[in-house]
Amino acid sequence: MVKPLPRLRLQGFNNLTKALSFNIYDVCYARTEEERQRYIEYIDEEYNADRLTQILTDVAEIIGANILNVARQDYDPQGASVTILISEEPVIDKKQAGKELISDAVVAHMDKSHITVHTYPETHPQEGIATFRADIDVATCGVISPLKALNYLIESLESDIVIMDYRVRGFTRDVKGKKHYIDHKINSIQNFLAKNIKSRYEMFDVNVYQENIFHTKMHLKDFDLDQYLFEEKAKNLSFKERMKIEALLKREIEELFHGRNLSE
């Protein structure tokens, strides 16, 4: 839960911008080219624009935002994108204004508060590794905090690896004229993760407190080969095959977690 500082009396609107970025990876092993193609098709359908729109709509509700506009698109051959423009308060009463005013209100908030998601399925051409990445950005202006949606987003997607960045920018001024560069307490993104999530993941932080930049990356602690096999069971594989596949998957997870290729 976000812990606010003592309530400030502000001069005008709260101008702080809070941005939360997610990179979520799902890693899989598919033995044949046909299985890898079916994995891509499965992921493409599982996380199509309609499903992603529902997830982001839920995020808007969780953080207490009002939806202004939704744009979504499925791509050929694969992938999807959704952008939702949001505001802290209802911008306009549709019954009291025409379409032109509503459109202007949407444009005015476009660069301030929004939620976006883009998906990137891909496969290794030879080794059977297939990955799915979802990039999610939640940017808010005002008192709304994107950190409230952390746990929901992790649970909603198949999150083997999660890389998160949170930053606060701008300032808000109180009635005495003093500038405030953050309006809640935080020393790590981990502060806002549920206990059951923290117990399942290995986590690592890089934070720059004086710049209000917070970075957390995490991956699942337990490795169950069956959870990574597509259309296959570990019990049907030979010991040698299991060891080979497990090594490939663990290497892929390690490289994605650290963001660099490991030496042979």
Swiss-Prot record:
Enzyme's top EC category: lyase
SUPFAM superfamilies (UniProt xref): S-adenosylmethionine decarboxylase (SSF56276)
Site note Cleavage (non-hydrolytic), residues: 112-113
BP GO terms, sorted: spermidine biosynthetic process
Catalytic residues (UniProt): 113, 118, 141
Modified residues (Pyruvic acid (Ser)): 113
Quaternary data: Heterooctamer of four alpha and four beta chains arranged as a tetramer of alpha/beta heterodimers.
Its job: Catalyzes the decarboxylation of S-adenosylmethionine to S-adenosylmethioninamine (dcAdoMet), the propylamine donor required for the synthesis of the polyamines spermine and spermidine from the diamine putrescine.
PANTHER family: S-ADENOSYLMETHIONINE DECARBOXYLASE PROENZYME
Annotated family: Belongs to the prokaryotic AdoMetDC family. Type 2 subfamily.
Protein name per the record: S-adenosylmethionine decarboxylase proenzyme
Species for this entry: Stenotrophomonas maltophilia (strain R551-3)
Lineage: Bacteria, Pseudomonadati, Pseudomonadota, Gammaproteobacteria, Lysobacterales
